[in-house]
């Protein structure tokens, strides 16, 4: 209860002095706190903010440099991609040319082999025909030479008369 009495007495003294207890009106404490705040603000502005600003500026510079490097890398990649596409197109054209030449050469080799084989077949057929003709002529000559003797032998067997004698011929 003493505390309440002391508070009421303090309020009464303040009212007697003519001061009002309005918190919106600045008093000495406010100016003291304002002075301390300004000192702290000056200390922070002098010793804390410049290093932070320096670090932030360095970071901004690094970010800008990284962006420039990324842009340069993207341009180099695009140029390399274009070179790659160009080289691939040239390689495809060259491969197509090689493939076309190989097919043409293959067709030529096949046609040459076919012509050679046909020539060999024709030559073999001609040789076979010539050999058959020679054998036929030889057999024909042999048969003509032996036809008289064979017919006499055959007649002798069938008829039973010897036809090779001069009496039978006349």
Curated annotation (Swiss-Prot):
Pfam families: ATP-synt_B. GO terms for molecular function: proton-transporting ATP synthase activity, rotational mechanism; proton-transporting ATPase activity, rotational mechanism. Gene3D superfamilies: F1F0 ATP synthase subunit B, membrane domain. The keyword Cell inner membrane does not apply. Keywords: ATP synthesis, Cell membrane, CF(0), Hydrogen ion transport, Ion transport, Membrane, Transmembrane, Transmembrane helix, Transport. It is a single-pass membrane protein. This is ATP synthase subunit b. It comes from Mycobacterium ulcerans (strain Agy99). The lineage of its organism: Bacteria, Bacillati, Actinomycetota, Actinomycetes, Mycobacteriales. The gene is atpF.
């Amino acid at each position: 209860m003493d505390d309440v009495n002391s508070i009421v007495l303090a309020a009464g003294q303040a009212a007697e002095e003519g001061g009002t207890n309005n918190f919106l009106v600045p008093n000495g404490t406010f100016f003291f706190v304002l002075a301390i705040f300004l000192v702290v603000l000056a200390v922070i502005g002098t010793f804390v903010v410049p290093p932070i600003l320096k670090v932030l500026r360095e970071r901004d510079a690094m970010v800008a440099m990284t962006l420039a490097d990324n842009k340069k890398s993207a341009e180099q990649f695009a140029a390399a991609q274009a070179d790659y596409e160009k080289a691939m197109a040239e390689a495809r054209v060259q491969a197509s040319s090689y493939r076309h030449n190989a097919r043409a050469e293959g067709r030529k080799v096949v046609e040459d082999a076919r012509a050679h084989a046909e020539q060999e077949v024709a030559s073999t057929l001609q040789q076979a025909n010539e050999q058959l003709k020679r054998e036929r002529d030889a057999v024909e000559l042999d048969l003509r030479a032996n036809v008289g003797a064979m017919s006499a032998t055959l007649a002798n067997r069938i008829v039973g008369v010897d036809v090779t004698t001069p009496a039978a011929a006349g």
